[in-house]
A protein has these predicted regions:
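Bacterial N-terminal signal peptides
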Residues: 8-19
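Bacterial N-terminal signal peptides that target proteins for export
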Residues: 1-9
């Protein structure tokens, strides 16, 4: 039994060392998303959608968000759903508590997007963010190498929201060859999902309640701001790498 315990301790130590050397020296294994899988791209870049449960104003914002992604120059086509089994479904639920979507194409089932009432009044920011998930993109601040770029203050995260900050291994990303992007539409703001979010000052990584603090940079006022509802240049590059390039969309 003693020999077994020794061997187990050695293996555990090696596993921790491997995690530190390959996934970021400061990444705490307790903050790693487990049982994750690499998202799948939508076949042919065709995404059927259903927005019939939304109000007229919400439908307009959802369509604008789709147009933002198509303007990236990626080979993407959003089409109204007819009888497809796999499609993006805007649920129309504004009381779900959080904005949610599954990541990527789901074989044999739909992707549900929930957006709270507050965010339907903030232009197309959140619809574009949740569509990013539906296209297969994780949160930027959950990258395997994020510790080189941001500090995550887990002590300030709202109960039940840690999963939105846990880091995801590189093997579980649909594309992992782009640089870290503070301006990504998939990056949270400084205070989001914070336990004292109402007291936190977005754009100030030194705020006592801040969850995200850029490492050695002045990007506090950049991360998660999504200026003019833009999808960043790096977001666009990711979309083109996954779905191919639509030269006609780029030239417009």
């Amino acid at each position: 039994m003693t020999g077994f315990i020794v061997r187990w301790a050695i293996l555990l130590g090696l596993a921790r060392l491997l995690a530190q050397t390959t996934l970021g020296a400061d990444s705490d294994p307790a903050h790693m998303q487990v049982n994750g899988t690499k998202p799948m791209a939508w076949p042919g870049g065709v995404i059927p959608y259903d927005i019939t449960k939304l109000s007229a104003d919400e439908q307009t914002l959802a369509l604008r968000a789709m147009a933002r992604w198509m303007a990236t120059g990626a080979q993407l086509q959003f089409i109204p759903r007819s009888n497809q089994v796999e499609y993006v479904n805007f649920t129309g639920r504004t009381d779900a508590g959080n904005n949610t979507s599954q990541d990527g194409f789901q074989k044999g089932k739909r992707v549900d997007i929930n957006i709270t009432a507050f965010w339907w009044h903030q232009a197309e920011w959140m619809p574009a963010h949740e569509l990013g998930h539906a296209l297969g993109f994780h949160h930027e601040h959950q990258r395997w190498d994020r510790d080189e770029f941001v500090t995550i203050h887990y002590e300030n995260i709202k109960p039940g929201r840690q999963h939105d900050y846990d880091w995801i291994p590189q093997t579980n990303w649909i594309v992992s060859s782009t640089a870290y992007d503070y301006r990504s539409i998939m990056h949270y703001r400084v205070c989001w999902a914070g336990a004292c979010e109402s007291e936190c000052k977005d754009g100030d990584g030194n705020s006592p309640c801040a969850v995200i603090d850029p490492v050695g940079t002045n990007f506090d006022r950049v991360i998660g701001q999504w200026d003019d509802n833009h999808i960043s240049a790096t977001d666009a590059e990711k979309a083109r790498r996954v779905y191919g390039t639509n030269a006609a969309a780029i030239s417009r």
